Amino acid sequence: MCMKASERFRRPFRRLRDFLRSLDMRRNIGIDLGTVNALVWAEGRGIVLQEPSVVAVDTVTDRIIAVGRQAQEMIGRAPAGVETVHPLEDGVIAQYDVALKMLQHFIRRACGHMLLPPRVMVCVPSGIKDIEEHAMVEAAREAGAGRVYLMEEPVAAAIGAGIDITAPVGRMVVDIGGGTTDIVVLSMGGVVVSESIRVAGNRLDEAIARYVRKEYGVLIGVRTAQTIKMRIGALYSHRQVRSVEVRGRSAESGLPVVITLSSREMLEAMAEPVSTILDAICSVIERTPPELLGDIMAYGMVLTGGNSLIYGFDHLIHKVTGVPVRVAEDPLTCVVKGTGMALRNYRQLSEGAIHLTKERRDRL
């Protein structure tokens, strides 16, 4: 009798608890906090922010002057006492305080005024270290997040590219971002084989700048190199040779000069970092179980990330590996779209895909 009375007493409270859970007013926010660009997804609104991961700081007062696109426009043009900072390097936080301010800015813009702090999922490279993971979680919490989840970038990219990662089928994704290249083989909601290398868009830009200095004796900035890469970058023979005029400074005289670069030069210019990326892809393929490799040959490898748009990258990878390759639709946004889809279905995904802080794992 006592047990039945106790159960009758508890039942209304359980119903109230379930009702309150159904009225959870936390907003889901997905963040692709990249080395070069940051994208933010908000539930019910889609992608609400896509800006450079740059912050302008007053070096005297440490005050944040501008964030995102406004800060990027100051690069190379800022007056004395103002420094433009990329708070992330190779996909992880390099300058904590600046990264915190940037996250606060992005979360406020995405959420506005809220009754409860948002549930936030941040994407991180596959090979992130414990201390780097901790820094990202703490920065998100201090920036105003309630519950914090971390998700590996290539897993989010796979989901955002429309791949059903819960299926008992091997799928392979290569996410070529700004700071890292993340390669993963997925099956049944978990990661089977993965590798993350800190060679990606930034290293390609640096390689182009080195090439221009070596071959032409001209100094250019990384932003100029990035523009060259996206305009005429090519890793496979192009039917029409493209060219671009580049303005720089003579390393010998220090005077302004103008040179013309051709798309045919890009493979040589980017050869070293591209070779490193290809080696990493081959390494993952070699470590993939034969059964899953058969699936990958059937379904193909999917490329995501902004640098997958470089002309001929997919053809080059196919030529080297023998695996069919395709570039995802809208590869720039796959990661952040994947975070949104994962937040809506996080209970169905294994911990191989979503990492939670320990104190929050018990609350789910």
For the regions a protein language model found, what residue spans apply to each?
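Acidic, divalent-metal-coordinating active-site segment for phosphoryl/phosphodiester hydrolysis
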Residues: 179
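Nucleotide/phosphate-binding catalytic cleft detector across ATP-hydrolyzing
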Residues: 1-176, 184-301, 308-364
